[in-house]
């Protein structure tokens, strides 16, 4: 549901990261050993000259998510990136950040972004996603975020959970 909503509002989503981001593919297949894995979203930034791996998580960020995105970034760097391109960055969009865990992340090309689901009562019930950036991250990565502080996207519920 989260990926579908982002894809429905792709232009708005990309604009929140700043200028130069282009969408390559959702569920981008990569082969690791004899198995295929799928990157939630693969982007490219023409100004930073690098790929961006986006992983969407509906819960609090866990150490396994960091290992997963780092693996995906390494696969892109080894198999897709050219010698003239910069290293791939990774962005984990999660329901809840874990600042304690991120103190120990050694790869400075991995970022976390938190979203919040808020119930909105109207004719058709829907959710809003709000990306909250800490002031520290905004200052450190303002070139990457383009100075934006939040984005709202509507997710229409289609029954079920």
Describe the residue ranges of each PLM region.
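Charged, terminal alpha-helix-loop-beta segments
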Residues: 1-161
């Amino acid at each position: 549901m989260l990926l579908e909503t982002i894809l429905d509002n792709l232009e708005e989503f990309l604009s929140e990261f700043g200028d130069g981001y282009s969408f390559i593919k959702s569920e981008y297949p990569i082969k690791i050993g004899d198995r295929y894995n799928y990157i939630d979203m693969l982007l490219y930034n023409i100004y930073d000259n690098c790929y961006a791996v986006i992983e969407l998580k509906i819960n609090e960020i866990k150490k396994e998510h960091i290992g997963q995105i780092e693996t995906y970034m390494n696969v892109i760097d080894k198999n897709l990136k050219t010698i003239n391109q910069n290293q791939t960055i990774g962005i984990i969009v999660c329901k809840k950040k874990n600042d304690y865990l991120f103190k120990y992340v050694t790869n400075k090309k991995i970022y976390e972004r938190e979203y919040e689901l808020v119930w909105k009562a109207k004719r058709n019930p829907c959710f809003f996603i709000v990306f909250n950036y800490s002031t520290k991250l905004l200052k450190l990565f303002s070139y990457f975020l383009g100075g934006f502080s939040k984005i709202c996207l509507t997710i229409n519920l289609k029954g079920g959970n």
